[in-house]
From Swiss-Prot:
EC number assigned by the record: 2.4.2.18
Similarity comment: family membership: Belongs to the anthranilate phosphoribosyltransferase family.
Name of the protein in its database record: Anthranilate phosphoribosyltransferase
Annotated binding of anthranilate 1, by residue: G104, N135
Gene, per the UniProt record: trpD
Residues annotated as binding 5-phospho-alpha-D-ribose 1-diphosphate: 104, 107-108, 112, 114-117, 132-140, 144
Organism in which the protein naturally occurs: Mycobacterium marinum (strain ATCC BAA-535 / M)
Keywords: Amino-acid biosynthesis, Aromatic amino acid biosynthesis, Glycosyltransferase, Magnesium, Metal-binding, Transferase, Tryptophan biosynthesis
Biological processes, Gene Ontology terms: L-tryptophan biosynthetic process
UniProt pathway: Amino-acid biosynthesis; L-tryptophan biosynthesis; L-tryptophan from chorismate: step 2/5
Enzyme's top EC category: transferase
């Protein structure tokens, strides 16, 4: 299964320094020259954006220039830390310390069905607590929030309600605009410029529930290791994944590259789902539609329908269960995958996933 392996340490990424005095001309000048920012400068820029002191042109220039330069893990970590500091806080006493998130950067341009959304429900039904962070579609026809809404889940719950959902149902959804109101200006700019930027990396890194484990999809192969580096500095157990067909998911059309984050280190692996008996799918078999179409697909898969979409959902759900198992230093790679795949399949075939969705819908509508 593992064709190649490379390791790096979170210690390679220096901690962010106090935010220095800076200016947009100084900062943008460095970026357009291809130079890394000084420690604290990325944090300064994000502080300007989140506080509403940055103009739209400055936000757009920064977002694009940072991605073109290729950010460091330290720079992205500063952006995420400032964004989290502005987020609506979750009730810490009600949030378990072993939650998992399943989310991607978006931006792969493929418009697949909402695999991570379906996988989240399966993982929760398998007994792993899930706090999913997500938003409406930015470039595809339906984002995770759009599909959940079409399924009947109320997506605009606040911190206390999400915490209750997690504790009573086993899953909660943090709708990004509800928890990151100060990010509104950057969201508008991101939609207007219409191309992936450094901001695509921030969604998976800024879940306000701060889950310690996750299956994190990255559509950008050159940036996935940077995301993994940020998670490593946090001591997370995460699989950052990039389908070698370009998907920000574990794919079944070919191999995937995985950056496994555990105990502060990052290992790069090549993962072949065929090693676990998965048939190769065609990308066209994983394509989605509008929210109603994706919701119908989700109901079918959670109801037990076989086929390429189910395979991809089971694979991604298993990946999240593997990441969750990584919170224990005793977790072993192959046994964890075997366990995760079995638990994901049973969660669907037993009806547990379908039943959990029904309970979640009822809870969210009456909380």
């Amino acid at each position: 299964m593992v064709l190649s392996s490379e390791a790096s340490s979170a210690a390679d990424h220096s901690a962010a320094a106090p935010i220095p005095t800076s200016s947009w001309p100084q900062l943008l000048g460095r970026l357009t020259e291809g130079k890394h920012l000084e420690p604290g400068q990325a944090g300064w820029a994000m502080e300007q954006i989140m506080s509403g002191n940055a103009r739209p042109a400055q936000v757009a220039a920064f977002a694009v220039a940072m991605k073109m330069k290729v950010p460091t893990a330290g720079e992205v970590g500063e952006l995420a830390d400032v964004m989290l500091a502005y987020a609506r806080p979750m009730p810490a006493d009600l949030i378990r310390d072993d939650t998992v998130d399943i989310v991607g950067t978006g931006g792969d341009g493929v418009n697949t069905v909402n695999l991570s959304t379906m996988a989240s429900i399966v993982v929760a039904a398998a007994g792993v607590p899930v706090v999913k962070h997500g938003n409406r579609a930015a470039s595809s026809l339906a984002g995770g929030a759009d599909t959940l809404e079409a399924l009947g889940v109320r997506i605009d719950l606040g911190p206390d309600q999400v915490a209750r959902s997690l504790n009573e149902i086993g899953i909660g959804f943090c709708f990004a605009p509800q928890f990151h109101p100060s990010y509104r200006q950057a969201s508008v700019v991101r939609r207007e410029i219409g191309v992936p930027t450094v901001f695509n990396l921030l969604g998976p890194l800024t879940n306000p529930a701060r889950p310690r484990a996750g299956l994190i999809g990255c559509a950008f192969a050159d940036l996935a290791e940077i995301m993994a580096g940020v998670f490593a500095t946090r001591g997370s157990s995460v699989l950052v994944v990039h389908g070698d067909d370009g998907l920000d998911e574990l794919t079944t059309t070919t191999t995937s590259t995985i950056w496994r984050v555990q105990a502060g280190t990052v290992d790069k692996l090549t993962f072949d789902p065929g090693d676990f008996g998965f048939a190769r799918a065609e990308l066209s078999q994983l394509l989605g539609g509008d929210p109603q179409a994706n919701a119908a697909e989700a109901r079918a898969v959670l109801g037990g329908a076989a086929g390429p979409v189910r395979d991809a959902v089971v694979l991604n759900a298993a990946g999240a269960i593997v990441a969750h198992a990584g919170l224990s230093s005793r977790a072993e790679w192959l046994p964890a995958w075997q366990d995760g795949l079995q638990r994901a399949a049973v969660a669907i075939d037993s009806g547990a996933a379908e039943q959990l969705l029904a309970r979640w819908v009822r809870f969210s509508q009456h909380v």
